[in-house]
Design a protein with these regions (language model features):
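C-terminal binding/interaction regions
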Residues: 2-18, 67-135
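Short Gly/Pro-enriched turn/cap motifs at secondary-structure boundaries
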Residues: 20-23
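Short beta-strand scaffold segments in enzyme catalytic cores
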Residues: 25-34
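Histidine- and/or cysteine-centered catalytic micro-motif in compact active-site loops
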Residues: 33-35, 44-45
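Hydrophobic "anchor" residues
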Residues: 38-39, 112
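Compact, glycine-rich, soluble single-domain proteins
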Residues: 44-59
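Feature captures the catalytic cores and cofactor-binding loops of soluble hydro-lyases/lyases
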Residues: 59, 63-67
Length: 135
């Protein structure tokens, strides 16, 4: 499938504006392309009990799974800084559903950084391959 990166960037930047981040003031948006061609978005949602905060990337994955999509083609993360890389927890959650995944990081200043899940999380922990297809 050809990846429409512009559409993913626009979706990530749009949802970033909906982020609920009154504590950090650090809004993040994520747009995840499913194998079906659908785009799933997520923003970070913070909480007064700080540890309950959920990142944009995990919200995008969970939204996709709730819609029945478990296979992914690309991810765009839009943040304030030039390089807002997914946190370790989000990398592990992505690895549950992706062997590898091209990831584009987009900063508010327009900086684009290409990376991939395997680059960010080599040797991810998994029980067995493709377990998400049966569960
Ligand atoms: N955050 C994300 O949503 N994604 C990332 O990749 C990094 C961090 C959020 C969590 C928290 O709401 C804020 O950014 C500051 O850490």
């Amino acid at each position: 499938m050809a990846i429409d990166w512009d559409a993913l960037i626009a979706a990530a930047q749009r949802v970033r504006k909906r982020a609920y981040a009154p504590y950090s003031r650090f809004q993040v948006g994520a747009a995840l392309l499913g194998k079906s061609g659908r785009i799933y978005v997520g923003c970070n949602v913070e909480n007064a009990s700080y540890g309950l905060t959920i990142c944009a990337e995990r919200n995008a994955v969970f939204s996709a799974v709730a819609e029945g999509e478990r296979e992914f083609v690309a991810l765009v993360v839009a943040g304030k800084d030039p390089q807002v890389f997914p946190c370790g927890a989000c990398r592990q959650v992505l690895a549950e559903f992706c062997d590898d995944l091209p990831i584009l990081i987009v900063g508010e200043d327009g900086t684009q950084t290409e990376t991939s899940l395997c680059e960010l999380l080599p040797h991810a922990f998994r029980f067995k391959e493709n377990i998400h297809k049966v569960g």
